[in-house]
Swiss-Prot record:
InterPro entries (UniProt xref): ATG2 (IPR026849)
Upper lineage: Eukaryota, Fungi, Dikarya, Ascomycota, Taphrinomycotina
UniProt keyword terms in alphabetical order: Autophagy, Endoplasmic reticulum, Lipid transport, Meiosis, Membrane, Sporulation, Transport
Function summary: Lipid transfer protein required for autophagosomes completion and peroxisome degradation. Tethers the edge of the isolation membrane (IM) to the endoplasmic reticulum (ER) and mediates direct lipid transfer from ER to IM for IM expansion. Atg2 binds to the ER exit site (ERES), which is the membrane source for autophagosome formation, using basic residues in its N-terminal region (NR) and to the expanding edge of the IM through its C-terminal region. The latter binding is assisted by an atg18-PtdIns3P interaction.
Signal peptide per UniProt: none
Membrane-related topology note: Peripheral membrane protein
PANTHER family in the cross-refs: AUTOPHAGY-RELATED 2, ISOFORM A (PTHR13190:SF1)
Localization of this protein: Preautophagosomal structure membrane; Endoplasmic reticulum membrane
Free-text comment about domains: The N-terminal region (NR) associates with the endoplasmic reticulum (ER) and is responsible for the formation of the isolation membrane at the PAS. The amphipathic helix in the C-terminal region binds to membranes and facilitates atg18 binding to PtdIns3P to target the atg2-atg18 complex to the PAS.
Homology family: Belongs to the ATG2 family.
Name listed for the protein in its UniProt record: Autophagy-related protein 2
Cellular component terms (Gene Ontology): endoplasmic reticulum membrane; phagophore; phagophore assembly site; phagophore assembly site membrane
Organism per entry: Schizosaccharomyces pombe (strain 972 / ATCC 24843)
């Protein structure tokens, strides 16, 4: 705003004091007459001026204003003053003081009519070239008077003869007089009325002013005072003839004001009354029953005499006081006090105001406004406003439609009958600035309230001491608006909120439609729209001015109320602390930023009982701290990026982008320090109800297609420092997930995902059971090499790839250093699914949903922990590398999953309790802290292995090269899963105690939770009990020769057969079986057949047998065999496991697991892994040692049995036993040495360094199938079919010379014809559908095999496999639920046994046990045929094994004893000679009987000679080798000396290095003989030298006594070796098969 220089000082024309008083009066009278005459339509007569100067008062009535003068002084081209009237004009003048001029102007009944017109392009630009940029009417008045009255003033000066008195230009004098008049004039105005409208409609904007005064605060002061009372702004429209019944003037020809054109002096004007005016009742605004007539009315105006319609827009009924002053050339001071104001708007009013405002927007060709005067640079404001009330009337969707109107005026004044009223009220407003800075303005207010139909929606600052504030700043090129709200509350009843959004949508739509309607009805606006061209996109530079809006809320509370029913209410409360909202714009660049220090969400449920609302539940939904959200887009701009900086507040900074964008992008960035989410079923239900209510009530439904558009590329970034998710289940348990850091990036365009990245750091999860037990589920594993603050555990990534016309959409997931804990007793996954995803049984799952993305999971360096139900042990699976591929789900295809595991390590621990961890915690923490110093070169593998073993775990297995595929089908709501395992290499290494624990852990993990199974074995009720007794066969026992009257304890249990007679059932054995089965099994017909009394056949399937644990005598064995056992004669060459396949053919499976190419290597180690086992053994040994040292005479038979397998015998010669090294490997020293010396020995019971037994399983294959449940009797539930190509047990004991313990018999024809060595099929059935019990059917077959049994190896296996901890023994004594076998079929097989005796148990010999008697001999090539067995009705594996042993041992003893004795080395030759002699005589007889040929005699002679020679050579070779071995041992003893300690060495067999041909035998025999002779020579030649070293005769005799036997033995050793090697070479040349047998049987050297 430009300030005139004369306004700065009212006494600027002091030079006029030199003029005479008469001249001054005449000049002032002329100036006033010209000034008033210019304002009015007619000039003021000189007589009127004379009256003014004589009486000091001039009053004029019924005046018309000079609109040309008004248009000239108000130099805006779009404003045209068409008519103006004054009812009364009073001018007062203090004529006594002309120098200090004091003029008072009073105006009554001012009426102005302003018409907005489009700019006239024909006008010259010079007309407006000096127009002010802001209104300065006083300057324009002076300029106007200079143009119109300057010449008249000069003529007046000449006519009056004042040239001599006026020195200078009369033009300057006139300016001074006018300036003095205007500066010293005080204005009083009453009843002012202004109409603003356009020429094309009758609707006008009416501004009414009741009273206004404008004057100086004090005389000779620069301050001006403006007082206004009663301001009213309305939108009015005259009613047409058809509506009012009276004539209406045309819109452009007549004005709203009528008057007379005469002027006269009116007396008594002080008593005139002002016209009535429309007033607002403030109570009616606040009242909920406000009527529209308070704002819209049809009335008769006193002055207008015309009926009209009006809408009250603005009203201020109090006193408006404004004081402003000019302190310097560029400083303006304004003080103002504004009373309560009311603003009442609707869509028609806003559209009409926007329509009028459009005339003030210059067209491109309109001359601009410019000024050469300096702008205002300093401003001092102090404005106080009592209150501002804004009322907004919104039309509801069902209200009247505006588009049905054709008349513009009627449309603007059509008031809907139904609508919502929104009210906003602001109290105690103050606007000020500091330091006179116009670039910084501050606005404060005490409180702000928003109502909707008298219901409070928003309340800010009411309950706090500090006021709300708005600060406007302009600093350099940044314009900012800072809004500070100390506190507030937003309460949104959901019904009101939905009505609010509906009304807002209708409100904005009405404004838009009305604007378009008004623009189309105006030719000027229509022409502008037709010629308007959209601005072209422009490049935005970073140095353009920026505009910022910052809104800060210290405390904010948002409440959402939703009525679920008439008796239920849901309340959602958001509590926000320090909320910052920022919007920054630079040109077309725009960014929105939201920062929240703390935000919490709480949900509450209320029920109404007896008209009282009671809180039922309350829960916290989520909590955030220090969260930041920012969004911007690059639409129509150059490439730029946004960075966030923090000083006092967070604010975005625009920077040039490093890369160019291909098309517009929208960016969303979200960062939060702590994000905690708490979810319960109630919270989910309430949020779901809230979402459904909002979604169903939206005016424009939100769909995925409307959320995204393909024209934009959307980018989302999320950063979370700490994230936690808590899920509460129905049973009171909860699941908590926590991430220390989250990084998320996602890019999409429309509905197309472009890229995705999600990184989770330091992931952990816990499960809180119903009993408040905290169980860790997921945990992160730290890398001890690097002290990383954040460890990446999960990485999800996706990138859209297009190749060869097809989309390869794959989501990559990488999981590293993550641990998962599995608890069978806490099924947290099923609990979560039951709680949050309940399945409706009436709505089956028909098909998988479409998921067009492949998933590739890469799992590295992770651990899975398996926690049993009832044990303290734990199993760890260390997954070094695991790859999972999941195919996309498209078009109802099955779910395909492929799993590849390169290497997995299995660890186990016996007790996972605090006592175990306490000893390891300090060490582990120290190693973690100092890992970079102690372990700088450790790999991830070594580090995790170190941590696991430090906690007490033992590595028990390694699984490599696992390949698994999974296919899941969903057809008609039924799932069928096919799992295929194509490859697996398993390496197992364990001790006896860890093996026993592993079996128990796997059994515990595979078992199901205990359930009520009381109806499993209930007998069916007998409907007719009497009838059932009549069906008893009383002769049953008599027919079987059983005395049922005797003592039942002395009788064996007899099983009742269902149909067949037991006496007629016998075992039939084919005598010629051995002839056709094996050439080594001829002449089996000579064996005695089994009588029919030995076995009993039982056809029942539910029999229970009782088999004695030991084979005591023949009669007891026969009684034991009469218990549901059936021997079936068949040849194993024709054996098949297809007998059970017919029962499962054609059934639909639910789960099927197929596996093949599985290889298992199991290394059995001596010693013990667990500290508890070692402590028990060491304690027992220590007790025996103590008792041995105290008692000289101890029974040699005293012994202690530990763990059902370890026998510790008493011994007397033992010294101190040190148990401090009990955890060291057991093979660090020989235990025998400990017991042979009377010194301190170290007891070592730890795991042996080397394996003792190696079990190798090759090509394990088979399938496991689970079938759908059926209500049929004996329904098959599942079946297991398993087979293996080879099962080999290697003997690695140092005391054993044999290589294998068990393996396939390669000489058998069936081993060459069949691929699988062993095969088993187990079928699980349910006997009756109404019972829950399950029964098994087993079929097993094995090919002929060969066993090389060393007694030490056998003892180790027995001790290893029978190991049982006391806890497991107690468990077995509690009568567990053993599996029940309906039927067991064991197919026949052939076993060849070699057995080496080493020691015998004297107690066993005295008791007459068969195994101990057999240990006195050595067997080689003993052949045993195990017949096929069919067993019915057994419970448990123990009964099953006892039945097998009893039946097979009895059969071997009765029918195959000759085959067993044939393997005894001394007897084998006798049998061979006897069979040879038999062949000499039997073969010719059979030849003569057959074809009358004597050639069979020669064949018999050749066969006899071959067998005899081979056995003779083998027997002599064994004798020579045995003699050589004894001589070698004697030589070793003599060389070491009798007092030297025997060094432990690995047992070596001389048969392992035997020559394969006669040439090798002769060569090796010659070499051995030569070494023996050379050794004797060397010993003999060294004897004199050794005797000379001794000085005494005793030493010489001792040396000679030791060396002379060596001289004699060494040639004998060479000779026996020569004979042995020669005979072995000759025997192997004659028997090629024997060479292969020796290679398999004996260990090779090295």
């Amino acid at each position: 705003m430009r300030l005139p220089s004369w306004l700065k000082n009212s006494s600027s024309w002091l030079w006029t004091a030199a003029l005479s008083r008469t001249v001054q009066r005449r000049l002032l009278a002329f100036a006033l007459r010209k000034l008033i005459g210019s304002i009015l339509l007619e000039n003021v007569q000189p007589e009127d001026i004379d009256i003014l100067f004589s009486k000091g008062v001039l009053m004029l009535s019924n005046l018309q204003l000079n609109c040309s003068f008004l248009n000239a002084v108000v130099s805006l081209p779009m404003i045209n003053f068409t008519k103006g009237t004054l009812r009364r004009l009073i001018l007062r003048l203090n004529v006594t003081d002309i120098v200090n001029l004091n003029v008072e102007l009073e105006v009554n009944g001012l009426s102005l009519e302003i018409e907005l017109v489009p700019p006239d392009e024909s006008l010259s630009s010079t007309t407006y070239e000096d127009a002010p940029s802001q209104l300065d009417i006083l300057d324009n008045v002076v300029e106007y008077m200079n143009k119109t009255a300057s010449q008249d003033f000069e003529d007046e000066v000449i006519n009056e003869g004042l040239e001599s008195e006026i020195d200078g230009s009369s033009h300057n004098l006139l300016d001074s007089i006018l300036q003095k008049c205007l500066a010293s004039t005080s204005v009083l105005m009453q009843d002012a009325l202004v109409y603003i409208g356009t020429a094309n409609m009758s609707t006008r904007l009416e501004a009414k002013l009741d009273f206004m005064s404008f004057s100086s605060v004090k005389s000779n002061s620069t301050s001006r005072l403006l007082n206004i009372n009663g301001i009213t702004v309305s939108m009015v429209r005259p009613i047409s003839k058809s509506n009012a019944g009276s004539s209406s003037p045309p819109r452009s020809e007549e004005s709203f004001v009528s008057m007379d054109s005469s002027s006269s002096i009116v007396e008594g004007f002080e008593n005139d009354l002002s016209p009535s005016q429309v007033t607002l009742n403030e109570s009616s605004i606040i009242s909920s029953n406000r009527e529209e007539e308070s704002f819209y009315s049809v009335h008769d105006s006193v002055t207008q005499k015309k009926t009209r319609t009006s809408w009250l827009i603005f009203q201020c009924s109090g006193e408006f006081r404004l004081v402003f002053s000019i302190e310097s050339s560029n400083l303006l001071v304004i003080e103002s006090h504004v009373p309560s104001c009311v603003l009442n708007i609707n869509s028609q009013v806003i559209a009409f105001l926007l329509y009028l405002y459009g005339y003030f927007l210059p067209a491109p060709s309109t001359p601009g406004f410019s000024s050469n005067k300096p702008p205002l640079t300093m401003l001092q404001l102090d404005i106080h406003i009592s209150s501002v009330q804004i009322l907004t009337h919104c039309k509801l969707p069902e209200s009247q439609d505006f588009s049905m109107h054709n008349d513009v005026d009627e449309l603007l004044h059509t008031i809907p009958s139904n609508g919502a009223v929104f009210e906003m009220k602001i109290n105690q407003i103050q606007i000020f600035n500091d330091n006179n800075d116009i670039d910084e303005l501050t606005m404060t207010f005490s409180d702000l309230d928003i109502f909707m139909d008298s219901v409070t929606l928003v309340s800010f600052g009411k309950s706090l001491q500090s006021p709300c504030s708005l600060i406007f700043k302009k600093l350099e090129r940044i314009v900012s608006l800072f809004i500070h709200i100390p506190g507030g509350e937003i309460s949104l009843p959901l019904g009101k909120a939905l009505l609010l959004q509906e009304s807002f949508v209708e409100f904005t739509n009405d404004i838009s439609n009305l604007q378009n309607f008004l623009s189309n009805s105006d030719p000027f606006k229509r022409s502008i729209q037709e010629t308007f061209e959209a601005p072209k996109p422009f490049e935005v530079e970073m140095n353009q001015p920026s505009f910022e809006i910052i809104a800060l809320f210290d405390e904010l509370q948002l409440q959402i109320l939703n009525e679920l029913s008439t008796q239920s209410l849901y309340k959602l409360t958001l509590r926000v602390s320090h909320l910052q909202f920022t919007r920054k714009s630079t040109g077309s660049l725009s960014s929105v930023l939201i920062f929240v220090k703390k935000i919490g969400c709480q949900s509450e449920l209320f029920n109404c009982e007896n008209s009282d609302w009671t809180k039922v539940s309350s829960s916290t939904a989520f909590h955030l701290s220090n969260s930041l959200f920012e969004t911007h887009d690059t639409t129509g701009t150059s490439n730029f990026a946004v960075s966030i900086q923090q000083e006092k507040h967070y604010y975005p900074v625009f920077q040039p982008a490093p890369t160019e964008f291909s098309y517009p992008e929208k960016h969303f960035y979200f960062a939060v320090d702590n994000f905690n989410v708490f979810i319960s079923k109630e919270v989910v239900r309430l949020f779901k109800t809230l979402y459904e209510t909002i979604a169903s009530s939206l005016v424009t439904p939100v769909t995925p297609n409307k959320l995204v558009t393909s024209d934009y590329k959307n980018v989302l970034k999320i950063r979370t420092r700490t994230f936690s998710l808590s899920l509460l289940n129905d049973d009171g348990s909860s699941f908590a997930l926590k991430c220390i850091r989250i990084k998320h990036y996602m890019c999409w365009a429309g509905a197309q995902l472009i890229s995705l990245s999600l990184r989770l750091y330091n992931v952990s999860a816990e499960y809180l059971s119903e009993s408040l037990e905290i169980l860790p589920v997921v945990s992160f594993i730290r890398n001890l090499r690097n002290d990383e603050k954040y460890l990446l555990n999960a990485d999800f990534s996706y990138a859209l790839k297009r190749s060869s016309g097809s989309n390869d959409n794959t989501i990559f997931v990488k999981i590293t250093d993550l641990g998962y804990e599995h608890y069978p007793t806490c099924p947290w996954i099923s609990d979560l699914l039951k709680t949050y995803f309940p399945q409706d049984p009436e709505v089956p799952f028909l098909a998988f949903p479409d998921f067009p993305f492949n998933i590739k999971l890469d799992l590295r360096e992770s651990i899975i922990g398996l926690n049993p139900r009832t044990l303290e042990a734990k199993l760890l699976l260390y997954l070094k590398s695991l790859d999972v591929e999941i195919d996309a789900l498209v078009a109802s295809n099955p779910l395909n999953i492929r799993i590849m595991a390169a290497e997995t390590v299995v660890y186990i621990i016996d007790k996972l309790n605090q006592s175990v961890l306490e000893g390891k915690t300090s060490v582990l923490k120290r190693e973690i802290l100092n890992s970079s110093l102690h372990f700088p070169g450790l790999s991830i593998k070594d580090t995790i292995e170190f941590v696991v073993k430090s906690l007490g775990y033992v590595e028990i297995s390694q699984l490599k090269n696992l390949t698994l595929s999974l296919v899941v089908n969903a057809e008609e709501g039924v799932f069928s899963t096919l799992i295929t395992v194509d490859n697996l290499d398993a390496q197992v290494q364990s001790c006896a105690d860890s093996t026993e624990l592993l079996i128990k852990v796997l059994s515990d993990l595979g078992s199901t939770e205990d359930e009520e199974i009381s109806d499993c074995y209930l007998a069916l009720p007998i409907e007719d009990y009497a009838k059932s007794l009549t069906e008893v066969d009383y002769n049953f026992f008599e027919n079987r020769g059983i005395d049922y009257k005797s003592n039942p304890t002395e009788q064996s249990t007899v099983l009742v057969s269902s149909d067949n007679d037991i006496s007629s059932q016998e075992i039939k054995i084919v005598d010629d079986y051995y002839i056709s089965s094996n050439e080594h099994s001829t002449h089996a017909s000579d064996l005695a057949s089994v009588s029919s009394e030995e076995f009993v056949i039982d056809d029942g399937s539910s029999s229970i047998i009782d088999i004695s644990d030991e084979l005591q005598d023949e009669s007891s064995s026969r009684d034991s065999l009469k218990k549901g056992i059936e021997l079936i004669e068949d040849y194993y060459l024709s054996q098949s496991t297809s007998k059970l396949e017919s029962s499962v053919e054609g059934k639909n499976y639910l789960l099927k697991v197929k596996f093949k190419d599985i290889n298992v290597n199991w290394d059995l180690h001596d010693g013990y892994d667990w500290e508890a086992t070692r402590a028990t053994i060491s304690s027992a040994i220590e007790k025996l040692c103590d008792s041995s040292s105290q008692n000289d005479k101890i029974s040699p038979e005293a012994k202690t049995l530990l763990f059902q397998s370890i026998v510790i015998k008493s011994f007397s010669k033992v010294g101190r036993l040190n148990i401090n090294h009990v955890s060291e490997p057991i093979d660090s020293d020989e235990f025998a040495d400990y017991l042979s010396k009377s010194i301190s020995y170290h007891l070592r019971l730890g795991k042996s360094k080397s394996k003792k037994i190696g079990i190798e399983i090759k090509d394990l294959q088979g399938s496991f199938t689970v079938y759908a449940d059926s209500n049929e009797p004996n329904a098959v539930l599942n079946d297991l079919d398993i087979g293996l190509k080879d099962l080999i047990i290697y003997d690695h004991l140092s005391t054993s010379t044999w290589n294998k313990f068990f393996g396939r018999d390669s000489r058998s024809p069936s081993s060459k014809n069949r691929n699988q060595h062993m095969n088993a099929q187990i079928v699980t059935v349910r006997p009756l559908p109404e019972l829950n019990n399950r029964e098994l059917r087993l079929e097993f077959s094995v090919l002929p095999c060969k066993m090389y049994i060393d007694q030490d190896t056998l003892d180790f296996l027995i001790r290893f496999l029978t190991f049982q901890t006391p806890s497991s023994s107690e468990t077995l004594n509690t009568e567990p639920d053993l599996p029940f076998f309906q039927s067991i079929c064991i197919n026949a097989t052939h076993v060849t046994i070699d057995f080496k005796f080493k020691s015998a148990d004297k107690v066993g010999l005295r008791s007459g046990k068969l195994p101990d008697l057999g240990s006195l001999i050595v067997m080689q090539g003993s052949e045993v045929f195990l017949r096929q067995l069919q067993i019915y009705g057994l419970s448990g594996a123990e009964e099953f094994l006892n039945a097998l042993l009893n039946v097979w041992l009895q059969d071997i003893r009765n029918n195959q004893l000759s085959k067993v004795l044939n393997g005894v080395v001394p007897i084998r030759t006798m049998f061979t000679v006897g069979r040879g002699i038999k062949d000499i005589f039997v073969s010719p007889v059979r030849g003569l009987q057959g074809n009358h040929s004597v050639g069979s005699f020669r064949h018999g002679i050749i066969k006899f000679t071959e067998k005899y020679v081979n056995d003779f050579l083998s027997l002599n070779a064994q004798g020579a080798t045995g003699t050589h071995s004894l001589l070698r041992q004697a030589e070793s003893y003599l060389e070491r000396g009798s007092n030297a300690s025997a060094s432990a060495s690995r047992a070596r067999s001389y048969y392992a290095e035997q020559p394969e041909t006669i040439e090798q035998g002769l060569r090796q025999g010659y070499s051995g003989l030569k070494q023996g002779l050379l050794g004797a020579k060397s010993t003999l030649m060294g004897l004199p030298r050794e005797t000379r070293s001794h000085k005494s005769l005793g030493g010489v005799a001792q040396t000679v006594g030791r060396k002379v036997p060596l001289i004699v033995l060494q040639p004998m050793i060479g000779a026996t070796e020569a004979v042995s090697k020669t005979l072995l070479g000759l025997s192997n040349s004659l028997q090629p098969q024997r060479r292969q047998d020796m290679r398999e049987k004996y260990k090779r050297p090295g």
